[in-house]
Regions:
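Gly/Ser-enriched beta-turn/beta-hairpin loop segments
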Residues: 44, 69-70
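Vicinal oxygen chelate
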Residues: 12, 16, 26, 56-60, ...
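Extracellular, disulfide-bonded carbohydrate-recognition/adhesion ectodomains
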Residues: 1-2
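Acidic/histidine-enriched, glycine/proline-rich intrinsically disordered or flexible terminal extensions
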Residues: 134-160
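Core segments of cupin and vicinal oxygen chelate
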Residues: 9-58
Length: 160
């Protein structure tokens, strides 16, 4: 596997290990690679996960428990290309469960406030269609959706 020198680093209040365990359960070829824990006398309880390193389909990610100093915003999101509606539905439902929140255009926040985009693979093809009217219809449809629905995007692009 290729060594990555640049990786996302996520700041959690105290739920990094729980979040990482959940995320790796959603994606194939994903795993927790290491967990370092706070020692006695640290800023968090001894034994609590300090930094959790994990891979999402080969992408290395680090997550740290460091208290309620910072919160996630939409300025950072994970974008996931989903090839089928079943995959979109599965990921969407799992990520908004237990306190997550849907947003517009395929965006959502998970229960920890981290933003995700669940995007059908065909969307880029529709948006880049040389028939600019077809592309505009697909874009207009997407702008009105919460969870993206492939059949509706294609129907809109086709003028149906």
């Amino acid at each position: 596997m290729m060594e990555h020198r640049v990786t996302p680093f996520l700041w959690y209040d105290s739920q990094a290990e729980e979040a990482a365990t959940f995320y790796v359960s959603l994606f194939p070829d994903s795993r927790i690679t290491s967990v370092s824990r706070y020692p006695e006398g640290g800023p968090m309880p001894a034994g609590q996960a300090m930094v959790v390193e994990f891979e999402l389909e080969g992408l290395p990610v680090s997550a740290m428990n460091a208290g309620p100093i910072f919160s996630f915003t939409e300025a950072f999101s994970f974008s996931v290309r989903a090839d089928t509606q079943d995959e979109i539905d599965r990921l969407w439902d799992a990520l908004i469960a237990d306190g997550g929140a849907p947003s517009q255009c395929g965006w959502l926040k998970d229960r920890w406030g981290l933003s995700w985009q669940i995007v059908p693979g065909i969307l880029a093809e529709l948006q880049n269609d040389p028939d600019r009217e077809r592309a505009a219809r697909a874009m207009q449809c997407m702008m009105g959706q919460t969870k993206l629905v492939i059949a509706e995007l294609v129907a809109a692009a086709d003028g149906r």
